[in-house]
Amino acid sequence: MELMNKKVMMKLALMVFLLSFAANVVNARFDSTSFITQVLSNGDDVKSACCDTCLCTKSDPPTCRCVDVGETCHSACDSCICALSYPPQCQCFDTHKFCYKACHNSEVEEVIKN
């Protein structure tokens, strides 16, 4: 009889554990304030943003995108996508009506047709 009570208690404990785990469901959304994004953050300084290779359409107004690939995106990038590699290869997918100033002395700006 005591063995039967232990089985019932174990089942009850397992059920309570699973219910408590299910009640605290993990939120699978991307949280931009998570620890890892704070560690890898480029900052929010738009004034220091730069881009060596900016592609723009010939539309009026133009739609421009920085296509630099590096270990991080420029500081004003909102949509930075990084490959899972070492070192990381990151590219910004934001579009603007302008290009940021060049990061280096040789400014390269290419214009593509819309």
Curated annotation (Swiss-Prot):
Annotated Gene Ontology cellular components are: extracellular region
| One Gene Ontology molecular-function label | serine-type endopeptidase inhibitor activity
Q: Which InterPro entries match?
A: Bowman-Birk_prot_inh, Prot_inh_BBI
Keywords assigned by UniProt, alphabetized: Disulfide bond, Protease inhibitor, Serine protease inhibitor, Signal
Query: Which positions carry the signal peptide feature in this UniProt record?
Result: 1-28
Q: Which domain of life is it from?
A: Eukaryota
The disulfide bridges present are C50-C103, C51-C66, C54-C99, C56-C64, C73-C80, C77-C92, C82-C90
Q: In which tissues is it expressed?
A: Seed.
Site Reactive bond for chymotrypsin: list residues: L84, S85
Q: Which SMART domains match?
A: BowB (SM00269)
Listed PANTHER family: BOWMAN-BIRK TYPE BRAN TRYPSIN INHIBITOR, INHIBITOR, PUTATIVE-RELATED
Tell me, what does this protein do in biology? Inhibitor of trypsin and of chymotrypsin. May function as a natural phytochemical defense against predators.
- Name assigned to this protein: Seed trypsin/chymotrypsin inhibitor TI5-72
